[in-house]
């Protein structure tokens, strides 16, 4: 390496380090406070639920902050998600329901996709507004279990499992699924599916027998969802904001309070997304409210 090349490499390394440091400091400062408006009683909270729902903690933290803020008269939630983990979706659902029950209005605006778990978290809102072309629905549960025994046989590798009882290694990728395994796992999926149905039936006031006819995992447009009673109205994010402002008695253009994620969450989300893309295929078994 000649001198000129060495100098160039050093300069690039210094610039990368400097940019990374500035970004880190900027994110840290942004995470220290939330974008609060001046007092005046014309504020709405604004929260986004985006991407695969894998962890509820940051969303729940933001929801609680909005619920406690006296300047926030109502909360507008933008959902742009195909769903995700069963537990994470239910925890977000429970927090939204708690806020609504305590008297602070919540309106959901559905984006391009608000399906399965994305729909699940929307159900406790006072009002759901979807775009006519929003992809929603997909009421159902999926469990994925890869079997890699054939691959191991090809490379000459064998895995021995010592277990306490017959069902202890159920779902193992190292052996074929038995009929007993399938029956037990189907029971788990069916139970979680029934929980999903019960939530939608209760929150949307749809009889179970009517709901079961459309809750077969199918996706639908926002317009179709409205016909089935799964959403309340069709409109844009601005329409949802206007409706919420009217519900809160706010005249004129309301100011939005947008919570900023904390720095640890930003990095954790980054690595989760990277892991999902690189190693998602081996994160099994898992059970999800998710549309592919």
Feature names for model-found ranges:
Residues 1-108, 113-114, 127-130, 144-292:
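N-terminal organellar transit peptides
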Residues 118:
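Pocket-flanking alpha-helical
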Residues 121-122, 225:
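Hydrophobic/aromatic residues within transmembrane alpha-helices
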Residues 125-141:
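Zinc-dependent metallopeptidase catalytic helix centered on the HExxH motif
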